[in-house]
Amino acid sequence: CMVCDMVVTYAGNIKEYKFYPAVMRSHARLTYTQVWNWIEKGGDYPHKAQIEPLYKLFQILQKKRQQRGAMEFESTETQMLFDDGGKIERIVPVVRNDAHKLIEECMLAANVCAAEFLLKNKHTALFRNHLGPTPEKLATLREQLGLLGLHLGGGDKPTPKDYATLAEKIAN
């Protein structure tokens, strides 16, 4: 696997990073549910020395992302449960908790470092860019939102924070 070793400030800024190859050896075999139960209960638990600072990092990175106005997309993942014969018995929704989000937030930070590394070192790479709506589509959106008593800020170029604010108003 490839490791992205990062130094992150208490303000959530990535100060430095390096990439290097490694072999992953998972001795603990933890589940998201186990980790979340330990974090919620507090006290003493296995691997606390590793999990507690990682959870604090997650909280810092999440707060930083919210301040930037990043959109939160909550989706329901599913899990297949199999019978003894190996056939699908049923499909159930996976309940996401902060242990899931902790891993996702760290992966996002590593992806940002990877993109920066590729750009800084002038490596050819594909990036997925999310273009904003055309002026016509933006006008139509604003018209429809107005009918619902809603407003999208940001003038001609709404930022992700403007969209996140709107999404929050809709959710409430």
Summary of predicted features, one role per range:
Residues 1-172:
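Conserved, carboxylate-rich catalytic/transport cores that coordinate ions
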